[in-house]
Amino acid sequence: MGKHLDSGSKLLDLGTENPFTPQLKAAGYSVSNTQGENLDDDFKKIAQTTCDCVTAFEIFEHLLAPYNILKELKSDKLIASIPLKLWFAEAYWNENDDWDKHYHEFEPKQFQFLLEKTGWKIKDSEFWTSPDQNKIGIRPLLRYFYPRYYIVYCERMQ
């Protein structure tokens, strides 16, 4: 974050307070989280919020239509991370909780296209793995080598 945002920047973090919130505040950022609104239905109200940067850590895969909020955001900067689609694992789906389902697990090119179509230009990005050290098997082994998460820093195209 410090690579792209000054300490003291005002952030709108899409999603309820999470483990990153206190870390961001400790680093000097002013953080406001959404309060559990349905971001598919209430995106216009949220998108009007004034801030230096919108952050979205593993949020867009939970939306039926992430295009809408991405298109409407008034911020000029966006930092977003997503879980990537893995060829050896099914998408996450909690049968008991409609808020805890992945409607999308993107390939990098799909997320990049979504961002481009909603007016964002990726300026920086990183991939990282998510090894599960407590399990034995082919899939846990593959998680050491295949990126599981993708994070981007974007700026609004003029």
Question: What does each model-found stretch correspond to?
Answer:
Residues 55:
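A conserved beta-strand element that flanks and buttresses the S-adenosyl-L-methionine
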Residues 58-62:
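A short His-aromatic
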Residues 8-17:
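Conserved class I S-adenosyl-L-methionine
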Residues 3-4, 18-23, 64-158:
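S-adenosyl-L-methionine-dependent methyltransferase catalytic module, highlighting the catalytic core
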Residues 1-9:
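Conserved alpha-helix/loop element of class I SAM-dependent methyltransferases that forms part
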Residues 23-48, 84:
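Adenosine-cofactor binding site in Rossmann-like domains, unifying the SAM/SAH pocket
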Residues 12, 32, 123:
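Conserved beta-strand positions in the Rossmann-like core of class I SAM-dependent methyltransferases
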